[in-house]
Every structure is written in structure tokens, then in C-alpha cells.
């Protein structure tokens, strides 16, 4: 279980949010909503361990997440708002590099399967710089297939996706949750995935 207690975030001299409490259990996902500037991305960066809260605690499996940050991050996959891909590498090479940075190895067949699931068959050997914004986003999202993680932390994952890709991603998140996974997702749009609850910032 992921538990957040009395979490506060300050940027410069501005308080983005304070006193945030929530929990996400296996088989659940949390939809984080709020206006631009309300702190949605900052909250997800706190959950991913990329920044520190002004106050409060994040707990994972009953222990403070920063007590064993390495073990926590091994079970977490964070995908940010921007499509963080290497423009000079191919779509396939991007997935293999991401796996290598996570300490694993991804075969060409495994990478191809993930890219095909996101409608990128035939584009696997193209340098990413030749892909559209939506296709770059799908290369990033293919990591949801190749990287096994209990907790998905996804910042605006539906950005730049067409209707078909949105449906595909909703299905993938739904499958992950149904299999006992967890997800925390920010999105400006309505999301049709069972097992969800909402947090308004």
C-alpha cells in the first residue's frame, strides 16, 4: 500500500499544497485533478522521490519510502509530462536503453511487442526525431509494458494521444490495476478506468 500523510509542498515562497492525505491499495488507482499550477506535477515528483516535501511522509508497504529508497524505486515507474526520449536513438533503442538504466536487459522481440501494442509497428527502427509528438509519447508509454513495477506514477500520460491510443492506455492501466497493481495519474480529462478514486488539489 502507498500511504501519504500530511504532505506539504513549497516552491520558492509559495505553498502549492498542504496537509495532503491519501492511500492507494493494490487494485486501486488515484486520479489527481486540479487547475494548472495547483501542484499536480510536484506531487508526483514527490511520490517518485525526485524532490522532498516541506512536511509530511510517504509510506510504502508500511515503511517510510525514504528508509529504503532503492527498494521503493525498484517497485515504482514514473513517467513525466514530457516525452523523455532520446531523439537520436530509434524507438526500439530508447526502450532498450531505459531497461539498461533500470539494470535489466530488453530483447529486440520484447521491445517490438511493446511498441506494436502502442501502434508503432514499422517505426521501431526510425530515429525518434522523425516521429510525431503523439508517437514519441507512445514510445515512452511502451515502458509500461517492458518495465515491471507495482506502482505506476503517470503525469498527464494522455497528452498528445489520439482517441485510439487513449483507449489503449486506459485498457493497459485497467489491466495493471485488475492484476493487483496501483497507479497515481494526473489528467485534465475524464478517465474511464475501473477501481479509481479522486484527489482534488
Q: Where do the protein language model's features map onto the residues?
A:
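Conserved ABC transporter NBD signature motif
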Residues: 56-67, 71-72
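ABC ATPase C-loop
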Residues: 144-145
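Conserved ABC ATPase "signature" region
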Residues: 108-123
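Q-loop/switch helix immediately C-terminal to the Walker
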Residues: 82, 87-102, 110
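Hydrophobic anchor residue at the start of the ABC signature
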Residues: 141, 180
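Helix-to-loop junction immediately C-terminal to a conserved catalytic motif
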Residues: 48
